[in-house]
Amino acid sequence: MDDIILIAVPEEAPAIMLWDNVFFTGIGKINATYTATHLLHHYKPKRVWNFGTAGGVTLSPGFYEVGSVVQTDMWLPALGLTRGKTPQDLCPEIISLDSNGVICGTADEFVEDPENLAEYCDIVDME
């Protein structure tokens, strides 16, 4: 299988949910990571597509290609760390992909005040 498509829940893409290369991860970063890791080892795809619903922070509704991701629920200012930086983590605060697309903030929580995230990301998701 050259391509796999990851979607959190069937309601996000009912038109393609029966394709044989579509897999549902469940909601949240841990569920998405676990499912993606399993599928990568099993199918060894050339490309992985993450498709789903995201909330707008600085952008209006539409279709966007993600160019970078940041963990918006990781924020420890008391330790002098910027949003997205995990202590002793080797990953950068912002992980850049092979695209010039928008910045997606990901978290395992719903966003109550998008204005607090406007300097960090354009859209938000939970996977």
Show the residue positions of the predicted features.
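Internal glycine-rich, Lys/Arg-flanked active-site/core loops of soluble domains
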Residues: A8
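Glycine-rich phosphate- or other oxyanion-binding loops that anchor nucleotides, phosphorylated ligands
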Residues: E11-M126
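Extreme N-terminal starter segment of soluble prokaryotic enzymes
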Residues: M1-I5
